[in-house]
């Protein structure tokens, strides 16, 4: 897979021109109730500080209002005593709630400043800008990207100075440092899938003075084929990069090209004339009188919320079939994902043993059984002529092919069963061609070398392990390349072909013979 699969211009243009004529479902901002506003933004820090300050004020008021009876004795006159009424905080206890009130008020102002700064950092726009931005996101070309970072850890040491009991001493510290060795990036190539925008129509924003919007990017698939194409490319990319180092960090996401995406946004109906509860003067005036929390609750209650999903649909015009003829049935692709759960097939693919020998290898092979080789018949492979397999391939061009894990020239292929039951036999080489096409007349292609100047002895001849006497000419090399091919169909495979199901360990593999 290439480091980055470029998106063709035609697929990018489809985002602009492939829009449905049917009106989209409108999506309007929602004004929440008071309870939901408190659950969304409770401002519990401001509420807690306000309650503590109110408690200090109540304590100070109680000290000023409440009177208690005191009894005092005169030290000079041991007999006389004095009874009077005084405040319970007259002996300096009043300074305790005052100190707490001052401390809490300072923390309260700091929290108000933090809330004000957070509000100022929000992206504020008007309604026209919101509509324009939504249109740009709808028309933007999506890009689903993957990133793989291969890395390992190395052991390093450093000298650290420590202090104990006033004495400095140096020690060696061992730590591990991450080292990135390879970074690879790729994109989802959806040229054969097509993409269009399917979000709802934004409406009703002008009915609220303040609207908080949240934008989320997402994508979906219109059919299973497009999803399998995505999963196949994704699995192939991470599989190619997972063994480059000890560890691999995988990242993935989607972004919209040529669009500055903002997740959170605040829209005002009239930015020049803000409502009184949204102005800066009202905020700090309420904060000075410790009424910031009620003002925030009122602001949240009068604010509408909208969660808008920018969704891209892949595969709405996916061409799952390619008819070779209007009168011929056609087949579907079987994706890589559908066979990745098969442990044995996955092992054959990973082992990279599914190779067809070249023409030179076939010519130079040792003929150990020349005397037992006889006529090749096209009926041995279920074809009705010399070019039967090529004709079959033309009828089912788009069928998924999994090449045999054991070559027809391998040693395992020499042990072809001459069984009378034309079933597919499985053993250590269960995907070999000889077993796939094993029948009463099992055929093995072999090559014997001869002189190029000898007209009576061809340079390449093939025999069959049958009892016929006249050996016909072998098929063309291009047709012979297709012999060790195992054709696996999905349930909705070729309609006109005869399928033979093979069951083993609860799995079913359909082959066209």
From Swiss-Prot:
It comes from the Eukaryota. The chain crosses the membrane at residues 46-66, 93-113, 274-294. The keyword Transmembrane applies. GO terms for cellular component: membrane. The keyword Chaperone does not apply. It is found in: Membrane. Keywords: Glycoprotein, Membrane, Transmembrane, Transmembrane helix. InterPro entries: Tmem151 (IPR026767). It is a multi-pass membrane protein. Residues 1-29 are annotated as: Disordered. Its main location: membrane. Residues 14-28 have a biased composition (Basic and acidic residues). Glycans are attached at residues 366, 418, 505. Pfam families: TMEM151. Belongs to the TMEM151 family. PANTHER family: TRANSMEMBRANE PROTEIN 151 HOMOLOG (PTHR31893), TRANSMEMBRANE PROTEIN 151B (PTHR31893:SF4). This is Transmembrane protein 151B. It comes from Danio rerio (Zebrafish). The lineage of its organism: Eukaryota, Metazoa, Chordata, Craniata, Vertebrata.
